[in-house]
């Protein structure tokens, strides 16, 4: 994907910068912020090596855009799900009210970051070297990629239609994750090891404490 971005941007540093920030903002609307950054940072490092530039401005911009993009949809950030659940908002309700503002804010911030980083965004890849960039060659398992994209598309469609389905967004996401585990035939030890258990325990403890404070009336005071 990193090589494809360079290719589409014709090797221009500024275009790569804008495309990557827009990608992270969009990805964060459907993935949580941490996942979007974990996906984008390795790409940024590879792009920086290819283009012989510093990855710092790009990574900082991605962190900012991931937070803005995450506010656009119900599934973009864990607090969004909590807020929507308490307010009785569906996926589409949240999208209609939040996405327009998030889109405007994203492009405004991208413009500001381009201006602030204008000295670092000069130059790019030599046109003669673009022919050596083969994005398709970097894919090691195309059948699995295609299956994963199909599952992702179905999950996103279910999120949009969940108001008419007897399923909560969390259940839809869990079904999608389970389907990918079965399709990829990933051993239990491997995917269980990759789960951020510490983060889950942290949020569980945080919600328990907040719930206790609400029940005893501490927050009302």
Would you name each region that the model predicts?
Residues 35-46, 59-60, 73-87, 127-128, ...:
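Re-entrant/interfacial helical elements at transmembrane boundaries that shape
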Residues 14-22, 36, 59-60, 95, ...:
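Hydrophobic alpha-helical transmembrane segments
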Residues 11, 37, 89, 114-126, ...:
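Transmembrane helix-loop junctions in multipass membrane proteins, especially transporters and channels
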Residues 20, 151-221:
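Transmembrane helical segments that form the transport core of multi-pass membrane transport proteins
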Residues 11, 50-56, 60, 72-75, ...:
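Juxtamembrane and boundary regions of transmembrane helices in multi-pass small-molecule transporters
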Residues 1-55, 197-221:
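Membrane-embedded alpha-helical segments and adjacent helix-loop junctions characteristic
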Residues 11-12, 20-33, 65-73, 100-109:
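Helix-loop-helix module between adjacent transmembrane segments
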Residues 69, 105-109, 113, 155-158, ...:
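Alpha-helical transmembrane segments of multipass membrane proteins
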